[in-house]
Regions:
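Short aromatic-cysteine micro-motif
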Residues: 199-207, 237-405, 521
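N-terminal Lys/Arg-rich, disordered targeting/topogenic segments
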Residues: 1-16
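Surface-exposed interfaces of beta-sheet-rich extracellular modules
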Residues: 76-102
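Solvent-exposed, low-complexity, repeat-rich "mucin-like" stalks and linkers
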Residues: 62-84
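Short, polar/proline-rich extracytoplasmic segments that appear immediately after membrane translocation
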Residues: 15-68, 125
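Conserved "repeat-terminator" motif of extracellular CCP/Sushi domains
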Residues: 98-124
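N-terminal module-boundary/linker segments of secreted carbohydrate-active enzymes
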Residues: 125-250
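C-terminal, surface-exposed recognition/capping segments
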Residues: 328-331, 358-382, 387-389, 396-397, ...
Length: 522
């Protein structure tokens, strides 16, 4: 038997070596192809870059899977191909973040071999803003028809144009009603393709929002001087771009409103109108009386409902954050409005209705109204938001802007002097990310305590209180006596009301005070 085996081996040894070598090479090639398919992807334009904060891991410890419009792909789209990253999902507790500037993935908290799946979606981008708007869960992107009706937008096609002063808009519908929810969303809370082009009834809409993309601006009055109304130079940027940190005139500053706690935001969604309906079920819609007679604490608590206890009603996620507008966020809207993307056509020319946002002079505090002129006295009549005159009261001078920021109700914002609660109703101040804290001299005429970007000390025509902000709007500084900030003034204030108006108050409820909601995608 042993002799036969030896004889067989002697006769077939060469063949065995040959086929074994072939099989081994085949396995090596196959394994290599599989490995490199999952660990490295290249586009036609450039090599992707992978970074990690964990040592001693190297590139080969990560496996990257690419999905384009839901389908697996063995390559990633190029940076200029019109795709955006919808999400990055990593296993084993790792966190993946996509860097749009480098067109690369950053992997953190990896403790073992890690696979990250990157989901790319084709979305429209207008080549002006740096990133396509990040829609929160439950948001339906919309455009407006000639009658002012909200129409479900196709995010693969043009639905905003910041160069043409058409800011991105989105709505939340009543997802507590299954008939409404199933009309617009699939089981994964994605907007149905079949919903595109449908008109959304105002009865279905709970809230309307406008997108303020992340930007940096060129400092024009950074050293506690004075200035006149002007077109502010703005450059849009990605949240992964290194922040500009200028402090002097002519330098650039990434607007602070786009830093929320320890998160850098691609933009913020701002309530299109003052808040309305009830404190238990807040709405943001036109043609209704705004929600008033609430102290700051009650307003703040109401603003949080959309991403906390009432998230299922609005279709939103508790992973995102709705909150009461901060003073700095008001400033971000004001500066974008005072730019070539808002009410200027170029650096020296205003749009037809002027550079100043027109007042909402409706004495019943109806949202979205406009007076017959920029500073009309109060009246019970209303030029509605979707009329030729009504759009003059928006930040863009058209239907795509934000309303009620001049007149309407006075708006409390989350800006406070040195944690003095006064009559606001808080037991203690909320987390620091939810308000702008001002310190410095306890004097109402000292404006140096304000910050760059909040549209206060930079937009003073004279360093005096009362009618000395841009366009003669009201100006006053917080102190321990009046620790809370009010913006915009109200319908009774005529010429001192405006986008750049800032006053100070106790924080208690008033029949003329409302508030605004901001929603951040985290």
């Amino acid at each position: 038997m042993n002799f036969k085996r030896k004889l067989w081996w002697a006769q077939h040894r060469t063949d065995v070596y040959k086929y074994s070598t072939f099989i081994l090479l085949f396995l090596i090639v196959t394994i290599s192809i599989i490995y490199f398919t999952y660990s490295k992807f290249t586009s036609k334009n450039e090599m992707t870059m992978y970074e990690t904060t964990v040592e001693p891991f190297i590139k080969n410890d990560y496996f990257i899977a690419s999905y384009i419009d839901g389908e697996w792909s063995n390559e990633i789209p190029g940076k200029e191909d019109g795709y955006v990253v919808d999400k990055v999902v990593c296993d084993n507790g790792a966190i993946g973040t996509w860097n749009n500037d480098k067109w690369a993935i950053l992997i953190e908290n990896a403790t073992k071999k890690t696979k990250c799946s990157v989901y790319f979606e084709l979305r429209y981008i207008d080549n002006v803003i740096a990133e396509a708007p990040e829609l929160a869960q439950g948001m339906i992107p919309v455009t407006f028809d000639d009658a002012g009706n909200a129409v479900v937008a196709d995010t693969h096609a043009k639905w905003y144009d910041y160069e043409a002063h058409e800011w991105a808009n989105a709505v939340l519908v009543n997802c507590a009603d299954n008939a409404i929810k199933s009309k617009y969303f699939d089981s994964n809370n994605k907007v149905l393709a079949s919903a595109v082009g449908k008109t959304i009834s105002m009865d279905e809409i709970m809230q309307m929002y406008v997108y303020i993309p992340r930007y940096k601006y060129q400092l024009f009055n950074a050293e506690n001087g004075t200035s006149n109304p002007q077109a502010i130079n703005i450059v849009f940027e990605s949240k992964t771009t290194a922040k500009s940190t200028g402090t002097k005139n002519g330098e650039w500053l990434t607007h602070p409103a786009f830093t929320f706690g320890d998160k850098e935001l691609a933009g913020i969604w701002v309530g299109k109108f003052e808040t309305s309906n009830t404190s238990e079920l807040p709405k943001i819609v036109p043609n209704v009386s705004s929600l008033r007679d609430m102290n700051v604490s009650a307003q703040f608590n109401t603003s949080r409902l959309m991403t906390t206890t009432l998230a299922s009603t609005y279709g939103t996620s508790t992973s995102d954050d709705s909150h009461m507008m901060k003073n700095m966020e008001w400033g971000a809207v004001a500066y974008l409005s005072s730019s070539i993307y808002g009410r200027y056509t170029n650096t020296s020319t205003c749009i037809d209705s002027g550079c100043e946002v027109w007042i909402n002079n409706n004495s019943n505090f109806v949202t979205g109204c406009a007076g017959s002129s920029v500073s009309s006295s109060e009246a019970s009549t209303c030029n509605a938001w979707n009329t030729a005159t009504g759009v003059n009261a928006s930040t863009t001078g058209n239907i795509y802007g934000i309303y009620d920021m001049s007149g309407g109700a006075s708006e409390y914002v989350m800006g406070n002097y040195n944690d003095v609660i006064k009559n606001a109703g808080f037991d203690s101040m909320p987390e620091s990310k939810y308000y702008d804290k001002y310190i410095g001299t306890d004097y109402y005429a000292d404006f140096t305590k304000y910050y760059l970007g909040d549209a206060t000390k930079e937009t003073l025509k004279a360093k005096l209180t009362e009618e000395n902000a841009w366009y003669g709007d009201y100006s006053k500084s917080v102190s321990s006596f009046y620790p809370w900030i009010e913006r915009g003034s109200n319908c009774y204030d005529a010429s001192v009301a405006g986008l750049f108006s800032f006053n100070v108050v106790y924080g208690n409820s008033y029949s003329t005070f409302s508030f605004r909601v901001v929603l951040s995608v985290l």
